[in-house]
Amino acid sequence: MHLQRNFFILIFFFISFLLWKTWQQKEFSSDVHKIINKYENVNLVNNNINKLASNIIIKTDVLKIQVNLYGGDIEKAELLHFKSKLNSSQSLVLLDTNENFVYQAQCGITGKDGADNLQKHIRPLYIAKRKYYELSRHNKKIEVPLQWISKDGIIYKKIFVLKSGEYDVSVKYKINNITNKHLKVSMFGQLKQTINLPEDKNTYTNNFALQTFRGAAYSSDNDKYVKYSFDSIVNKEKKNIVVTHSGWVAMLQKYFATSWIPDNSYLNTMYIGSSGDNLAEIGYYSRPIDIFPHSTISLSSKLWIGPEIQNKMAVIASNLDLTVDYGWLWFLSQPLFKLLNFLYNICGNWGVSIILITFIIKGITFPLTKSQFKTMAKIRKLQPKINYIKKKFKNNNQKISEEIMSLYKTEKVNPLGGCFPLFIQMPIFLALYYMLISSVELRHAPFFLWIHDLSDQDPFYVLPILMGVTMFFIQRVTPSNVTDPVQKKIMNYIPILFTVFFLWFPSGLVLYYLISNLVTIIQQKIIIKALNKTLK
């Protein structure tokens, strides 16, 4: 009885969690649509300024970026190895600039004698030798120099360096002070993005799937990873958040990120906030840097534009790999992903890797499963005595509970022992869920036949239905201590309820649960057979 009650409590919390997430997403979606309508007629791009300048294109084998010569900002970035949608011929556009949506990576030289003044909308108008640059197959990197000369004759060179197969962009500055003046400048980098997405970029789905984090984040000397949702930034004035040598600022979304990594040779101030035209901003500026008369200095920073590939991001900057947001169960999701990635390197298929990791998890938890069935068998053996206690004290529920607990203590039976494995599986299940919906490696990753994307739902619902069948079979062959007909009826509906929920879950997660159920059936037969021999 206690075992079944604990099981129902577990099911209650699981269903409550899913319903809460769904309600939260519906509220979020409603708010988003309201704010989108408010801003839909706002022109987010200053067309008068942009008409004065032209753009240049820089292309490698993995990146294609568009740089506006007015300021030298990156206004568009395509990830050539990632498609916008499954089976689409169009590359994914991460950074973009149009009338309804802005997502830019800005950088420059500001300060008392700098070329850039964002507050007054003053930017240098750079010149380039040509409009299109492409990395050849025989070269490992490409350098694209831009140049601007101030009215005082100070020469500013802004150089973009892109490498073959890499998503980090180096931005270098060479400032030649030919004057007799002592200059003070600061280097800055900023990311800005439309807070509320227009309809064509809103990936919200109205089902039970959990939504991943979208917002801004930073890392510093003292904090490895701090994040801000866009909801917490909207209508907030810019404020300095930390002064640090090391670290980065970033904007995050599902599977992809952009991040400025400043030069840690200088002390940098990081800031965050929003402007009045529906834009969130996060960035940094360095402490004032001296440029003496008739001298040249070199400055640099790095920009990550691409997928959240953890091992590559960790090389670019310390803690940058933490932008892969696994939620509150990150301490389980991270080792699970490392194990899954290790298995993938062996077998070359993410679906097979999920099957293998299921075998490993079920093998590790087998002692708990065995303990669960032992506890259930002991409780069934005590059922006649429990029924006698209920009959003897039928008008005194408190006495019944006391006598049953006394019986468990005498017989050395822990009624919670049968439910413990269920509680162990829940965090593993959720950790695997967050891993599957947050790891870019599984985006559009095929398994076999009709499963072309393990991070998305099964298009034909075959896996959820099979999972429901295995769950129903487990329920039928598992010896039960339930005697109440109402509870029995409710138990019969549990597989159906779970099948409905799993229809919209990532197919990789449903595959895990299906294989887990199949392994459970085999383990169950082995354990029950051994217990029957022991209890004879």
UniProtKB/Swiss-Prot annotation:
The chain crosses the membrane at residues 3-23, 346-366, 417-437, 454-474, 494-514. Keywords: Cell membrane, Chaperone, Membrane, Protein transport, Transmembrane, Transmembrane helix, Transport. It is a multi-pass membrane protein. Pfam families: 60KD_IMP (PF02096), YidC_periplas (PF14849). The keyword Transmembrane applies. One of its GO terms (molecular function) is membrane insertase activity. One of its GO terms (biological process) is protein transport. One of its GO terms (cellular component) is plasma membrane. Its main location: membrane. It is found in: Cell membrane. It comes from the Bacteria. Belongs to the OXA1/ALB3/YidC family. Type 1 subfamily. NCBIfam families: PRK01318.1-1, PRK01318.1-3, yidC_nterm, yidC_oxa1_cterm. Interacts with the Sec translocase complex via SecD. Specifically interacts with transmembrane segments of nascent integral membrane proteins during membrane integration. Required for the insertion and/or proper folding and/or complex formation of integral membrane proteins into the membrane. Involved in integration of membrane proteins that insert both dependently and independently of the Sec translocase complex, as well as at least some lipoproteins. Aids folding of multispanning membrane proteins. This is Membrane protein insertase YidC. The lineage of its organism: Bacteria, Pseudomonadati, Pseudomonadota, Gammaproteobacteria, Enterobacterales.
